[in-house]
A protein has these predicted regions:
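Conserved lysine of the Walker
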Residues: 36
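Hydrophobic "anchor" residues on beta-strands that sit immediately upstream
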Residues: 27, 89, 108, 319-320
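Conserved helicase ATPase motor motifs in RecA-like P-loop NTPase domains
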Residues: 348-350
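Nucleotide-state sensing region of NTPase/ATPase domains
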Residues: 45-125, 129-141, 218, 222-226, ...
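A conserved P-loop NTPase coupling/switch region
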Residues: 101-105, 112-178, 182-201
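Conserved NTPase motor "head" modules and their coupling/switch loops across ABC/AAA+ ATPases, GTPases
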Residues: 1-31, 168-319, 328, 332, ...
Length: 354
């Protein structure tokens, strides 16, 4: 799917904007704050069905009653996104829908400057990033993740209800000092049985798919990193398993055994929602050991591999959106970046011509 043009009306700072795209690489040049990233955001929304950073109300240009995004493709098809201030609709092949149908969603590889902070950011943001990446080409992963998150929320809501409706629980030595300050209340543990089964099931499905993705990435990570950085540093991405490697039965038993503690805390303390993705640089954690340039090369290498894996899994060559990616890259590495994405349509933003 090749984009021919993108037109925006009342989208963020743009009252009207029109970009005619090239089949391979298009460059959007402008000062910081001129709305370049908003163009990538609009393209992403038309291809994926939602923004990567904001709600529709935040996207709507101040003082406007609606926003509109129109993406045209060289095959004659188009996708229109229309938000009237209250609800969003998609217009595809003369059909209006509240959500972009799956068959019209197209894979995207997205680079944002904030991605450089992946190494040092919080585990929750790293999980969110990789969950989005894996879901780009694995619908089963997306489904398991949605079910896990729904079940986790239901379990946490129930924990809070028990904590509110019953005396404070104890009998659990949270501080490791051997002191229990409150009367123990064993209440409702059986009500959590089904939630625990589902969390163990979906949790290990997610963990397995996360590990398989990293296995594929790590197979070529060093090779692709070398093509950018041109040095022999060793890079690796590891899945740090919260609670270690366990079976589904062990996962379930852990949830059962920590029921009283979870009631006190008001949330589920154990699970794959506590796993982390750790970047290694020469067998040490990259945070604090790799330079900013080395981190940028690691992230870009991941993007190249992501695009290739999406193509392998879906047969579709993703559209590549790169925001301010040339910053801090010399001419040689800029050319290398474009060369690595030679088989994809690439749209790049920059503060200057390159």
């Amino acid at each position: 799917m090749i984009i021919e043009s993108i037109k925006l009306v009342n989208f963020r700072s743009h009252d009207e904007f029109l970009l005619h795209c090239k089949k391979k690489t298009s460059l959007i040049v402008g000062e910081n704050g001129s709305g370049k990233t908003s163009v990538l955001e609009a393209i992403y929304e038309a291809l994926r069905g939602k923004s990567f950073r904001a709600t529709d109300e935040e996207i709507l240009r101040r003082g406007s009653e609606f926003y509109r995004v129109e993406l045209k493709f060289i095959n004659g098809l188009s996708t229109v996104v229309l938000f009237d201030g209250q609800k969003k609709q998609f217009l595809v092949e003369d059909k209006r829908t509240a959500r972009l149908p799956k068959k019209y969603r197209y894979p995207v590889v997205l680079f944002l400057p904030d991605d450089l902070h992946l190494v040092a950011t919080s585990p929750i943001k790293r999980r969110a990033y990789f969950d989005r990446v894996i879901a780009e080409f694995d619908e089963a992963y997306s489904s398991s993740l949605a079910k896990y998150e729904k079940t986790l929320k239901q379990r946490n809501d129930l924990l809070k209800k028990y904590a509110k409706n019953n005396d404070r629980c104890s009998g659990v030595d949270l501080n490791g000092d051997g002191i229990n300050n409150y009367r123990r209340v064993d209440v409702g543990a059986s009500d959590f049985f089904s939630w625990n089964i589902l969390l163990a099931k979906y949790g290990l499905e997610i963990r397995d798919k996360r590990q398989k993705y990293l296995d594929k990435l790590n197979t070529v990570f060093n090779q692709v990193y070398y093509s950018i950085a041109e040095n022999n540093d060793q890079v690796f991405l590891k899945l740090d398993l919260f609670g270690g490697e366990i079976s589904e039965a062990e996962y379930f038993n852990r949830l059962e055994s920590e029921f009283s503690r979870d009631v006190i805390l008001g949330h589920t303390g154990f699970g794959i929602h506590r796993d982390d993705f750790v970047f290694l640089f020469n067998e040490k954690e990259a945070d604090g050991t790799a330079s900013r340039g080395e981190l940028r090369s690691m992230i870009l290498a991941m993007k190249f591999i992501e695009a290739d894996l999406i193509f392998q899994e879906t047969g579709k060559k993703p559209v590549v959106l790169l925001d301010d990616v040339f910053s801090e890259l010399d001419n040689t590495r800029q050319k290398c970046l474009v060369r690595n994405f030679k088989d994809n349509q690439v749209i790049i933003t920059s503060v200057e011509e390159v």
